[in-house]
A protein has these predicted regions:
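Short, mixed-charge amphipathic alpha-helical segments
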Residues: 157-158, 164
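C-terminal/peripheral segments of proteins
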Residues: 1-141, 149-152, 162, 168-362
Length: 362
């Protein structure tokens, strides 16, 4: 826990130093001044661990409707009643949310056509499962049509004095339904396009989004594609990568997105954090960090860590899934008691000789 004086001094500091503010907004880092006792942790007699925050000073969110979280701060865990006023150690508020958080709210609130609720306005077990596994991507929903329009207006782009024809790319994206199902054609091309941007571009106005963030409308802002040449250059780079590796632009996602376990591959549907999807499936990345590992080091992994060109996540064995929607459970309180359904996507056993090594993965 921090004192009010320490928090106020920290707020003054980050308002004067953009680097410190950026570290907080993007990494969750609260940089304190070690030279002053003011910034030392406070001990409270009612906390079992010295220096921690008393329970009554922590965010506690209750709702008659729902609460949720998608690896963001507490601010929009109940989007009907945004919560503020707690220590900055619990994360930023009134700032842009991840595209995945925004998609979850779209699904829960039935926004912009993403309505899976019944006539009663509530979710049955089947309806919530349908919402989770719909596999629609919000970034595609928000940006793809404008990208296709820009592509059709300028179907040729120069890269290193080589003309790249984007006509087939335009058609592939136009015909894609913005989903990340195993059979989805266009998902791979869009992924190779959007992952050429910094992940933070999916949250903030700038390289991807033209519209400004509005804290009064955090679920629907920012929006609108930033129209610039970079969009088509990134698309041409994605086309070149796939062409150079003999991968059709309309390859079904399931042909590439796999879980590799002891010599057997399993097709996995779902999308990554750039794509704004409830069913998160994370592949190894070209850079280690919170988004995944740069390689898989496991005795049961039978894929390849060889990166294809400059792709963020594509290897010679496809998109190697390492984590994401791993334990999924739905629970319904019925007149006969709780009724639950659950799945562990990586299966229960790590022993390849066990019958439970890959049964749930399959």
């Amino acid at each position: 826990a921090l004192s009010d004086d320490a928090i106020n001094a920290w707020r003054d500091r980050i308002n004067k130093a953009p680097q410190l503010k950026n570290m907080y907004l993007t990494k969750g880092l609260v940089i304190l001044d070690e030279s002053t006792k003011r910034d030392e942790w406070l001990d409270h007699p009612d906390t079992p661990i010295p220096g921690t925050t008393p329970f009554e000073e922590r965010p506690l969110i209750e709702s008659d409707f729902y609460v949720f979280n998608a690896n963001d701060s507490y601010w929009l865990s109940d989007p009907k009643k945004p919560t503020i006023g707690y220590s900055p150690l619990y994360g930023p508020t009134e700032t842009p949310r991840s595209i995945r958080t925004r998609m979850n709210i779209h699904l829960l609130e039935g926004l912009d056509g993403f309505d899976f609720r019944g006539e009663d306005g509530l979710f049955s077990v089947q309806e919530i499962k349908d919402a989770l596994m719909d596999n629609s991507g919000l970034t595609a929903h928000l940006l793809k049509d404008e990208l296709v329009d820009q592509c059709q207006q300028s179907p040729n782009i120069l890269i290193n004095d080589i003309s790249i024809d984007l006509s087939n790319a335009c058609s592939t994206l136009r015909d894609w339904d913005n989903r990340y199902n195993a059979e989805s054609k266009g998902a791979v091309l869009f992924r190779e396009w959007i992952t050429r941007y910094n992940y933070l571009s999916t949250m903030y106005t700038g390289d991807l989004f033209a519209g400004s963030f509005d804290k009064e409308n955090p679920t629907t802002t920012p929006l609108g594609l930033a129209r610039n040449e970079r969009n088509l250059i990134a698309l041409a780079e994605a086309v070149t990568l796939l062409d150079d590796n003999g991968i059709p632009l309309d390859v079904p996602l399931g042909n590439l997105q796999k879980a590799h376990r002891a010599g057997t591959t399993y097709t996995v549907h779902g999308g990554n954090r750039y794509e704004g999807i409830a069913n998160l499936q994370v592949a190894t990345t070209s850079q280690s960090g919170s988004s995944g590992r740069s390689y898989i080091d496991s005795s049961i992994f039978s894929g390849s860590n060889e990166r294809l060109g400059d792709s963020e996540t594509l290897t010679s064995s496809g998109y190697n899934i390492v984590h994401g929607s791993s334990f999924i459970m739905t629970l319904n309180f019925t007149e006969d008691g709780p009724s639950a359904e659950a799945i562990l996507s990586y299966s229960q056993s790590g022993s390849s000789s066990s019958e439970h090594f890959s049964d749930q993965t399959e």
